[in-house]
Amino acid sequence: MTEKIKLARYRSTSYFVGYTGDGGHKQYTWSGSKNGKADIKEVPKEVVEWLTMNSVCFDKGELVIVEDNETTKEIKDSIVESEAYENNIHTKEEIEKMIKSGNIAQLKNKLDKITVDSEKQFIIDVASEFSDDIAAGKLKVLADWMGVADPSLLFD
């Protein structure tokens, strides 16, 4: 039996992979997170290794390796853009905490590390759910970070 590794989709949009590594074609689909619960699928280790070599799904945080063991550590170490991977894989809860806790300077620092557009949009989507509870200064920081002059265009 082949070793399985759990991959999660933290973002709210769906994501699919067309695996062609074994000469055939197999599709894996993640429907995206719902109500803050990530969509997690177990896939064969060979698929994960194939993804690290043939896609940017880990570099861009599209999929997240959710287990911590010797095998997954080796795979995480093989991700070319490991820093980008770590900076672009936030759960809904982590985003809420990032926005609610700390000051504006800390928020700016954390946001500046995020480089993937779909992760940025996920953060705005999560923030929109509780924007009435976010201080005006933090809303302005989020809007500036997205290149929008008026926060009301993002958060109404």
UniProtKB/Swiss-Prot annotation:
This is SPbeta prophage-derived uncharacterized protein YonA. The gene is yonA.
